[in-house]
Amino acid sequence: MKLAYWMYAGPAHIGTLRVASSFKNVHAIMHAPLGDDYFNVMRSMLERERDFTPVTASIVDRHVLARGSQNKVVENITRKDKEERPDLIVLTPTCTSSILQEDLQNFVDRASMDSESDVILADVNHYRVNELQAADRTLEQVVRFYIEKSKKQGDLNLTKTEKPSANILGIFTLGFHNQHDCRELKRLLQELGIEINEVIPEGGSVNNLKNLPRAWFNLVPYREVGLMTAIYLEKEFGMPYVSTTPMGVVDTATCIREIEKILNSFDKDVVVDFESYIDKQTRFVSQAAWFSRSIDCQNLTGKKAVVFGDATHAASMTKILAREMGINVACAGTYCKHDADWFKEQVQGYCDEVLITDDHTEVGDLIARIEPSAIFGTQMERHIGKRLNIPCGVISAPVHIQNFPLGYRPFLGYEGTNQIADLVYNSFTLGMEDHLLEIFGGHDTKEVITKSLSTEEGLTWTSDAQAELSKIPGFVRGKIKRNTEKFARENNISEINIEVMYAAKESLNA
């Protein structure tokens, strides 16, 4: 446990609540002290939905600590069962309430006797896993619970659908452009003649989970959530799954070819061939392929970028920049430390260095050291970019409200390639704006601000030196300022004047 004002992946209970609140008619009860119950506010603020967040906090207060939690938790479960009539109630502790070491499974068993809803305890170790791992585990637990329940009741339908069909696993609330990606994936599959069997957990009903085995295969667009469920369904029913993220022209084609291979393994008499579809989409529907050969994109060739995000988006973005756009990825990184080996394997050969960390200060220092032309990362990298005056395109959760757009903005499939091409190009070209404004005027040019992440104490700039610095074009000013301050520190100079600036310049050129 560590104190931090920014976390890339939140605590485990947030992952459980994201999965539970994605399903229809599922209620989550969080056994937590005040302060851990911010999920409702966060989801209500960010997700553009009309429904209330179906999460209730069963608060651990001094009365609970004195008497024990059982009565309060059981009472909350049975009360919500009567009020909401949900299909399922999920009870989850938080890392704080886990310290109490209570037998919550016993509370669940007790509440189940008086509830018409199914009641389960989220089977997650709150000290060992983060938000994404917990979400993956909770989704698999819910699926397993209802598959086992259907087996006992004898109504599990294992007959495959007449036409090829797929389940999409892992689309859920607060995900990065998940709703838009889901629409694009549905469109893609329908154009390939594949029906959608179930989409879980977003908008899905737990009563339909028994129909999951009817699909011909499972599609897992994001590694972070859905993979455990796909592996369970493969082990239990021999269902194949595709886990290649269809992001970018190359990987979308790879994903479609994997689907083609699965469909052809089912019916030897009817052979499907999606090559003509891939060719048509790549050449005429996706604008990204011809854009990457245009003079606009060639201007970006060799430009330096830093990529950081969850494993899925950061790996895909790195490959798109390096392989499809000719951009030099100086560093690719992820905060998914549990998936470090897969990530390193994916980005091998596409970047100069790899960073695996969940500490935002490490990422900030690396960006300040590399000084890329653009950053592609999370909301935190956007903040870092603003402080360093480096443009940033947001490509991964965690994100703020501006990355829950009302318009259609998928990142997957062929329409996603267009969105990514726009994002990349706009991230780079807007960097010239300050420079052009300074040359042609029209705005008050802003004061020279410190562009370093850690403020340099004990260094003062004379007014002459500041005036000289303001004459330098904006897009290199930050670099020159940092180099001059570094030179001054190394030579124990506390006041920076014009002579020091020129001496620093000469020392770099030497």
UniProtKB/Swiss-Prot annotation:
Annotated EC: 1.3.7.7
List of residues binding substrate: G431, M432
BP GO terms, sorted: light-independent chlorophyll biosynthetic process; photosynthesis, dark reaction
Active-site residues per Swiss-Prot or TrEMBL entry: D296
Domain of life: Eukaryota
Record carries keyword Nucleotide-binding: yes
Needed cofactors: [4Fe-4S] cluster
Binding positions for [4Fe-4S] cluster per the UniProt entry: D36
Pathway where it operates: Porphyrin-containing compound metabolism; chlorophyll biosynthesis (light-independent)
Keyword set includes 4Fe-4S: yes
Extent of the signal sequence: none
Cellular compartments annotated: Plastid, Chloroplast
Gene Ontology molecular-function annotations: 4 iron, 4 sulfur cluster binding; ATP binding; metal ion binding; oxidoreductase activity, acting on iron-sulfur proteins as donors; oxidoreductase activity, acting on the CH-CH group of donors, iron-sulfur protein as acceptor
CDD domains in UniProt: Pchlide_reductase_B
Catalytic activity line of the entry: chlorophyllide a + oxidized 2[4Fe-4S]-[ferredoxin] + 2 ADP + 2 phosphate = protochlorophyllide a + reduced 2[4Fe-4S]-[ferredoxin] + 2 ATP + 2 H2O
Keywords recorded for this protein, A-Z: 4Fe-4S, ATP-binding, Chlorophyll biosynthesis, Chloroplast, Iron, Iron-sulfur, Metal-binding, Nucleotide-binding, Oxidoreductase, Photosynthesis, Plastid
Pfam family, one: Oxidored_nitro
HAMAP family: ChlB_BchB (MF_00353)
Entry function: Component of the dark-operative protochlorophyllide reductase (DPOR) that uses Mg-ATP and reduced ferredoxin to reduce ring D of protochlorophyllide (Pchlide) to form chlorophyllide a (Chlide). This reaction is light-independent. The NB-protein (ChlN-ChlB) is the catalytic component of the complex.
Family: Belongs to the ChlB/BchB/BchZ family.
Record's protein name: Light-independent protochlorophyllide reductase subunit B
Protein source organism: Chlorokybus atmophyticus
